[in-house]
Amino acid sequence: MTAATLVTLALSLSLAQHDAAPAPAAAPVEQHGAPAPEAAAPDAHAAPAGEHGAAVEAHAAAAGEHGDAAGHEGGHDESLGAVMMHHVTDGYVIEHPGFCHGALAWNCEWDLRETFGDALRFGALDMTPTKHVMMMWFASALLLVVVLAAVRKKSLVPRGLYNFIEVLVAFVRNEIAVKNIGERDADRFVPYLVTAFFFILFLNLFGLIPFSATATANLSVTVALALFTFLITQYAAIRAMGVGGYLAHLTGGVPKSLAPLWIIMIPVEFLGLFTKPFALTVRLFANMVAGHFVILALLGLIFALGTPWVAFGSVPMALGIFLLELFVAFVQAYIFTMLSSLFIGAGLVHHGDDHGHAEEHGHAGPGMGSEHGSHVAGASPGHG
């Protein structure tokens, strides 16, 4: 998988450089109105303009299909930048190897708009799935298959895939949920935390497969994931404290005798409610985008410097970053799940009753004494 990914990225950069070369030749045809023999070349090149791929760079009318395709006319550097953006941005075209244009090719394209047509268009609302949405569907289906396959092989002595899944689930429950939420309340939120962990993990790993895409490098996806945590956190807080206690919590623990300070504390505490999902959103998005940009930049050095000798240094470095991305895929899934449990646990604790809450958990289960109370207090709303 590693070698295939690097070869795929290198071929993409090479194709972009090759397609960008004839672009300046089309300018004199439009500006000076060259004779018919000279104009025949661009017409022949633009014939397959209805298709995506090389015709996008040659025919300006189809530039809208590929975002920054017009940037190829600007020169060599812009073409490399366009390829880098193409690998991390969303779209309606999925590239894949297969049989297309009458021959086997590695750069065939699946246009989702042609597949779904007008079936998911309702007036101005276009519900046609994009590339990243398809990746989420694929990841969800694969996750369901893996979990069901693991459960079917359940035995008294866990082994193989079932053992691996069980270890991860137990880790999320015991080391993340129980430690940050408390043993008394953890089991209510374990299903969400386990689902979030595996879903993000599969999305991160999908982005490392050749011809796939990283959905977690889409800001809309990370916002949606963080929004789920935000809503669950507010639900847990209102259920634990009631509406009155929840609203009183926005005063930041300032007593009524200092009520004028509420003018300052309430806006601060209110903004604090949204800094937590914002941190979840940006952290996951930035980490997943950064790794892919580094790999593409290292491979792009081969074409930017115009010499194959650079590959002896850039390819091993890109391979190292790729292996690091495998580790990052697990780390980011863990961090998102851990922070989500931390925020949920903080929502269950009233700002002024941290010690009492800790004492309750001290009797609820082992290892849940004042340490849990101080841990949650440090993450209470308004201090994140």
UniProtKB/Swiss-Prot annotation:
Keyword annotations of the record: ATP synthesis, Cell inner membrane, Cell membrane, CF(0), Hydrogen ion transport, Ion transport, Membrane, Transmembrane, Transmembrane helix, Transport
Main location group: membrane
Pfam family, one: ATP-synt_A
Entry's Gene Ontology cellular component terms: plasma membrane; proton-transporting ATP synthase complex
Transmembrane segments: 131-151, 189-209, 218-238, 258-278, 293-313, 319-339
InterPro entries linked: ATP_synth_F0_asu (IPR000568), ATP_synth_F0_asu_AS (IPR023011), ATP_synth_F0_asu_bact/mt (IPR045083), F0_ATP_A_sf (IPR035908)
Membrane topology (UniProt): Multi-pass membrane protein
Gene3D superfamilies reported in the protein's UniProt record: ATP synthase, F0 complex, subunit A
Cellular localisation: Cell inner membrane
Segments of this protein annotated with the region Disordered: 22-60, 355-384
MF GO annotations: proton-transporting ATP synthase activity, rotational mechanism
Family designation: Belongs to the ATPase A chain family.
Reported function: Key component of the proton channel; it plays a direct role in the translocation of protons across the membrane.
Complexes and interactors: F-type ATPases have 2 components, CF(1) - the catalytic core - and CF(0) - the membrane proton channel. CF(1) has five subunits: alpha(3), beta(3), gamma(1), delta(1), epsilon(1). CF(0) has three main subunits: a(1), b(2) and c(9-12). The alpha and beta chains form an alternating ring which encloses part of the gamma chain. CF(1) is attached to CF(0) by a central stalk formed by the gamma and epsilon chains, while a peripheral stalk is formed by the delta and b chains.
NCBIfam families for the chain: ATP_synt_6_or_A, PRK13419.1
Name this protein carries in UniProt: ATP synthase subunit a
Annotated organism of origin: Anaeromyxobacter dehalogenans (strain 2CP-1 / ATCC BAA-258)
